[in-house]
Amino acid sequence: MAESHRLYVKGKHISYQRSKSVTNPNVSLIQIEGVASPKDAKFYLGKRIAYVYRAPKEIRGSKIRVIWGKVTRTHGNNGLVRANFKKNLPPKTFGASVRIMLYPSNI
């Protein structure tokens, strides 16, 4: 039997990019599991992110939907990354789990 390989790493949607008074919902801040420094986070630049959720209405035989995004750059000194999604993630996803795909590979 073939050996299974990891296709993604788990992460959490922390917040939008923001200043003291202005929030920017175009840019989401993501904390990746096991990443604690900007040096480690650089590996994930350009990787695809999927927010997978279950919707009440079935479309084309499935209630599962996905919002896709991409890691654009690091954020701060704790290993957070900034990500842009095709459609902005709604605020109810703060704290929700996202999948950071291990492709496209840059090694």
From Swiss-Prot:
PROSITE patterns per the UniProt record, alphabetical: RIBOSOMAL_L35AE
Stored HAMAP family: Ribosomal_eL33
A molecular-function term among this protein's GO annotations: structural constituent of ribosome
* Naturally occurring in which organism (per UniProt): Candida albicans (strain SC5314 / ATCC MYA-2876)
What GO cellular component entries does it have?
A: cytosolic large ribosomal subunit
**At the top level of its lineage, which domain of life is listed?**
Eukaryota
**Keyword Ribonucleoprotein (UniProt):** yes
Record localization: Cytoplasm
Instruction: Return the similarity comment.
Output: Belongs to the eukaryotic ribosomal protein eL33 family.
Tell me how this protein assembles: Component of the large ribosomal subunit. Mature ribosomes consist of a small (40S) and a large (60S) subunit. The 40S subunit contains about 32 different proteins and 1 molecule of RNA (18S). The 60S subunit contains 45 different proteins and 3 molecules of RNA (25S, 5.8S and 5S).
Any keyword Secreted? no
Record's protein name? Large ribosomal subunit protein eL33
Supply the alphabetized keyword list: Cytoplasm, Ribonucleoprotein, Ribosomal protein
Instruction: Name the principal localization, coarsely classed.
Output: cytoplasm
| Biological role | Component of the ribosome, a large ribonucleoprotein complex responsible for the synthesis of proteins in the cell. The small ribosomal subunit (SSU) binds messenger RNAs (mRNAs) and translates the encoded message by selecting cognate aminoacyl-transfer RNA (tRNA) molecules. The large subunit (LSU) contains the ribosomal catalytic site termed the peptidyl transferase center (PTC), which catalyzes the formation of peptide bonds, thereby polymerizing the amino acids delivered by tRNAs into a polypeptide chain.
